[in-house]
Amino acid sequence: KESAAAKFERQHMDSSTSSASSSNYCNQMMKSRNLTQDRCKPVNTFVHEPLADVQAVCSQKNVACKNGQTNCYQSYSTMSITDCRETGSSKYPNCAYKATQAKKHIIVACEGNPYVPVHFDASV
């Protein structure tokens, strides 16, 4: 079974590009990362930074998660991210997405040993 840390990497890490390469980026990425397998995932964020930099956030600013848990951490620096949001015309299995580029602080939930990101909570 896929570990929570591996799932985070599959769903949220794209270190190979510095930003969304094209308007089709989200459609391709959401499909290739299996985020549209049994439904269209409405919103998903990809982080364009080295994995080590994202893992390091787990030792940065401790903040409360949206669900009230206390194991969330906010990055000290801004990171290059792409938000993929489902379009109005999107209908499973033909999921369609719009990409929004941003440089924001990310907030991730961390757990385990080693202490690594397992959930993308927000960007601010």
From Swiss-Prot:
Residues 1-13 have a biased composition (Basic and acidic residues). The active site is at 12 (proton acceptor), 119 (proton donor). Gene3D superfamilies: Ribonuclease A-like domain. GO terms for molecular function: lyase activity; nucleic acid binding; ribonuclease A activity. Substrate binds at residues 7, 10, 41-45, 66, 85. The keyword Nuclease applies. Pancreas. It is found in: Secreted. It catalyses: an [RNA] containing cytidine + H2O = an [RNA]-3'-cytidine-3'-phosphate + a 5'-hydroxy-ribonucleotide-3'-[RNA]; an [RNA] containing uridine + H2O = an [RNA]-3'-uridine-3'-phosphate + a 5'-hydroxy-ribonucleotide-3'-[RNA]. PROSITE patterns: RNASE_PANCREATIC. Residues 1-24 are annotated as: Disordered. SMART domains: RNAse_Pc (SM00092). GO terms for biological process: defense response to Gram-positive bacterium. Disulfide bonds join 26-84, 40-95, 58-110, 65-72. Pfam families: RnaseA. InterPro entries: RNaseA (IPR001427), RNaseA-like_dom_sf (IPR036816), RNaseA_AS (IPR023411), RNaseA_domain (IPR023412). GO terms for cellular component: extracellular region. It comes from the Eukaryota. Monomer. Interacts with and forms tight 1:1 complexes with RNH1. Dimerization of two such complexes may occur. Interaction with RNH1 inhibits this protein. Belongs to the pancreatic ribonuclease family. Endonuclease that catalyzes the cleavage of RNA on the 3' side of pyrimidine nucleotides. Acts on single-stranded and double-stranded RNA. This is Ribonuclease pancreatic.
